[in-house]
């Protein structure tokens, strides 16, 4: 399936333009630091742009009960995705799309702010924590890896975290459908 790239964005955003819009869906989160049981959650993600060379990003999650109804808010994160200009003088890879370097800045209401770096290659984005800053009252989050991808027109993502003394391990994943 071809990526739905848009041309009404700055050139540096075109490789990420398939993310633009509102996505909704559900996923599962679980980590030893949060107890043994997995929690189903609903999620809304919005990627936007205002004509400058970055994407705005907001994600909101809610716990879901067995019937799929929302029960309580879980998390909100907001930030900016900053693709770096591609050096078109460098030869393109023999296979696959040219990688786009990314810087992602995220803030959480729990007192955590992080900078992630990584690459986008066509419909796949891989990010890793570069810097994590926490307030004195924030939980002990020290690192994270994120993977985003488009599969069958849906946005899938997975998050691994190092949290409260536990090494990096799977924390959450979801499948989201574009709604606008």
From Swiss-Prot:
Domain of life: Bacteria
UniProt xrefs under InterPro entries: Calycin, Nb(III)_bact/plant, Nitrobindin, THAP4-like_heme-bd
Residue ranges annotated as motif GXWXGXG: 21-27
Family statement: Belongs to the nitrobindin family.
HAMAP family: nitrobindin
PANTHER family associated with the record: PEROXYNITRITE ISOMERASE THAP4, THAP4 PROTEIN
Protein name: Ferric nitrobindin-like protein
Organism: Kineococcus radiotolerans (strain ATCC BAA-149 / DSM 14245 / SRS30216)
Organism taxonomic ancestry: Bacteria, Bacillati, Actinomycetota, Actinomycetes, Kineosporiales
């Amino acid at each position: 399936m071809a990526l739905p790239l848009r041309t009404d964005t700055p050139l540096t955003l075109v490789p990420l333009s398939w993310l633009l819009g509102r996505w909704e869906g559900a996923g599962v989160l679980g980590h030893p630091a949060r107890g043994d049981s997995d929690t189903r959650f609903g999620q809304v993600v919005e990627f936007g742009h205002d004509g400058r060379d970055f994407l705005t990003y907001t994600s909101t999650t809610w716990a879901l009960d067995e019937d799929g109804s929302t029960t309580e808010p879980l998390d909100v994160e907001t930030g900016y995705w900053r693709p770096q200009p591609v050096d078109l003088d460098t030869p393109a890879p023999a296979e696959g799309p040219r990688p786009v370097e990314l810087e992602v800045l995220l803030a959480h209401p729990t007192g955590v702010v992080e900078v992630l770096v990584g690459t986008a290659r066509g419909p796949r984005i891989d990010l890793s924590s570069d810097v994590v800053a926490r307030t004195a009252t924030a939980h002990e989050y020290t690192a994270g890896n994120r993977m985003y991808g488009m599969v069958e027109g849906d946005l899938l993502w997975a998050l691994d975290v190092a949290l409260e003394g536990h090494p990096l391990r799977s924390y959450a994943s979801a499948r989201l459908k574009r709604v606008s």
